[in-house]
């Protein structure tokens, strides 16, 4: 197997299966191409919203999002928020998730984030602990729908 290329998303990644890869988390591939491009352009216009993909042989097989939040506290520092970490089922267990997380943590550090946080389900807690994350607090969620 080829080694994955980890990089920022490009418009052409929709043709390489980006939305199908997101289906591993939640249904994404059913949105229209126009809607996908609208979302893509909105994200690309915000330098604090970065989508990272993993590509093997012209196919997107993993992804995550890094949101960089400017803060008034911590002397105007930044917090990195990791969202939507995904690896296609057939590529899980091959350390691709680790490569994606290492890449995005370096990116957060490059953007001067003083910490990077994420929420996860219990079934992947050990993965993040192995990556150096520490349990810190509880998450509360309010669903608007």
Give, region by region, the residue ranges found by the protein language model.
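Conserved beta-strand-loop-alpha-helix junction that forms the acyl-donor binding cleft
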Residues: 117-126, 141-145
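Conserved beta-strand in the GNAT
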Residues: 53, 59-68, 86
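Conserved acetyl-CoA-binding loop-helix of GNAT-fold acetyltransferases
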Residues: 87, 93-106
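Conserved GNAT acetyl-CoA-binding A-motif
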Residues: 101, 108-120
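Helix-loop element at the rim of GNAT/NAT acetyltransferase active sites that forms part
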Residues: 19-31
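A short helix-loop-beta-strand connector motif used in the catalytic cores of GNAT acetyltransferases and
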Residues: 41-53, 81
């Amino acid at each position: 197997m080829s080694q994955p290329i980890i990089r920022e998303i490009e418009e052409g990644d929709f043709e390489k299966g980006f939305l199908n890869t997101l289906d591993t988390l939640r249904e994404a591939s059913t949105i229209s191409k126009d809607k996908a491009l609208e979302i893509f352009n909105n994200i690309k216009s915000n330098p604090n919203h970065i989508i990272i993909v993993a590509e093997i042989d012209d196919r997107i097989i993993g992804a995550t999002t890094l949101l960089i939040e400017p803060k008034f506290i911590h002397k105007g520092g930044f917090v990195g928020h990791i969202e939507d970490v995904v690896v296609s089922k057939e590529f899980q267990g091959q350390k691709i998730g680790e490569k994606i997380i290492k890449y995005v943590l370096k990116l957060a550090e490059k953007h001067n984030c003083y910490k990077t946080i994420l929420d996860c389900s219990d079934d992947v807690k050990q993965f993040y602990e192995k990556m150096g994350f520490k349990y810190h607090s509880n998450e509360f969620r309010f669903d608007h729908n």
